[in-house]
Swiss-Prot record:
It catalyses: sn-glycerol 3-phosphate + NAD(+) = dihydroxyacetone phosphate + NADH + H(+); sn-glycerol 3-phosphate + NADP(+) = dihydroxyacetone phosphate + NADPH + H(+). Sn-glycerol 3-phosphate binds at K110, G139, T141, K195, D248, S258, R259, N260. It is found in: Cytoplasm. Catalyzes the reduction of the glycolytic intermediate dihydroxyacetone phosphate (DHAP) to sn-glycerol 3-phosphate (G3P), the key precursor for phospholipid synthesis. InterPro entries: 6-PGluconate_DH-like_C_sf, 6PGD_dom2, G3P_DH_NAD-dep, G3P_DH_NAD-dep_C, G3P_DH_NAD-dep_N, NAD(P)-bd_dom_sf. It comes from Yersinia enterocolitica serotype O:8 / biotype 1B (strain NCTC 13174 / 8081). This is Glycerol-3-phosphate dehydrogenase [NAD(P)+]. Keywords: Cytoplasm, Lipid biosynthesis, Lipid metabolism, NAD, NADP, Nucleotide-binding, Oxidoreductase, Phospholipid biosynthesis, Phospholipid metabolism. Its EC number is 1.1.1.94. Signal peptide: none annotated.
């Protein structure tokens, strides 16, 4: 296939990367999709669909598959990175030698840098330099629904006004995909990481059998933790009432399409961490995000008791029910304290 020119190159051929590539192509754009496994890309090309993740969604004719990274990146100045957060920096290093001089980078990855807990924008600047335009898209999106063309809305934030406008034009589809611009580059990044953690907690609560009251309380107090951390990092608190905050949080905490939620349910039912991960069979971003978010909160002096108890379950073998009782037994306080 001719990949000499495209509106967007998508890096990452998992469920979400494929869904975004399909959406862009369905919008009338020529899109190049690249993945790290050439055999997987060749299979996608042969099948013209992603049988592993989105078996019922055929690829539009304008979605092109590419096994050669240099050719994929030469095709477009705009590059959408959709990879797990723990390999984000490594993937950018892999892309760097092949990027066009006019390249612009946007990512749909939700999370923080592994171990350090840094925002992904800080990682991108370190790898690619300060001058390259950067952007992030985040919000309540399950890949299957997006790929099926069901109505979806997300938030978009960028360091560059023109890039933001161009991306909004590329992604927005009046029939099914609404893209809201947001000037809060920090907040839009952070919401997607913290919601993964809280979704594990919501799953634990349901796995234990605590019911709807407990789940809703946990979501609400989880939003408070997200807002406290965001404010400490310089984000606009109102961002967390939007798509990248409350929207993504509610979706991930309440629907079993969420791997983080299903993982938490299994833990609440008594399964071990490794056993639950094995049963999910795909990356559970919230597992690593919990450690990273807690480290970030502690460095900035932010209290996040729900996140701390989830960490205790994941990394210190604490029983999920005991963690819940620890939260319920905390000292009484004002609801708006710290927000």
């Amino acid at each position: 296939m001719n990949t000499t020119h495209a509106s967007m190159t998508v890096i990452g051929a998992g469920s979400y990367g494929t869904a975004l590539a399909i959406t862009l192509a369905r919008n009338g754009h020529q899109v190049v999709l690249w993945g790290h496994d050439p055999k997987h890309i060749q299979t996608l090309q042969q099948d013209r669909c992603n049988q592993a993740f989105l078996p019922d969604v055929p690829f539009p004719d304008t979605l092109l598959l590419e096994t050669d990274l240099a050719r994929a990146l030469a095709a477009s100045r705009d590059v959408l990175v959709v990879v797990p957060s723990h390999v984000f920096g490594a993937v950018l290093n892999q892309l760097k030698p092949h990027l066009r001089p006019d390249a612009r980078i946007v990512w749909a990855t939700k999370g923080l840098e592994a171990e350090t807990g840094r925002l992904l924008a800080d990682v991108a600047r370190e790898v690619l330099g300060e001058s390259i335009p950067l952007a992030v898209v985040s919000g309540p999106t399950f890949a299957k629904e997006l790929a099926a063309g069901l109505p979806t809305a997300i938030a978009l934030a960028s360091t560059d006004v023109q890039f933001s406008e161009d991306l909004q034009q590329l992604l927005h589809c009046g029939k099914s995909f609404r893209v809201y611009s947001n000037p809060d580059f920090i907040g839009v990044q952070l919401g997607g990481a913290v919601k993964n953690v809280i979704a594990i907690g919501a799953g634990m609560s349901d796995g234990i059998g605590f019911g709807a009251n407990a789940r809703t309380a946990l979501i609400t107090r989880g939003l408070a933790e997200m807002t406290r951390l965001g404010s400490a990092l310089g984000a606009d608190p109102s961002t967390f009432m939007g798509m990248a905050g409350l929207g993504d949080l509610v979706l991930t905490c309440t629907d079993n399409q969420s791997r983080n939620r299903r993982f938490g349910i299994m833990l609440g039912q008594g399964l071990g961490v490794q056993e639950a991960q094995d049963k999910i069979g795909q990356v559970v971003e919230g597992y690593r995000n919990t450690k990273e978010v807690l480290a970030l909160a502690q460095r900035n002096g932010v209290e996040m008791p729900i996140t701390e108890q989830i960490y205790q379950v994941l990394y210190s073998h604490k029983n999920a029910r005991e963690a819940a009782l620890t939260l319920l037994g905390r000292t009484k306080k004002d609801e708006k304290s710290g927000i």
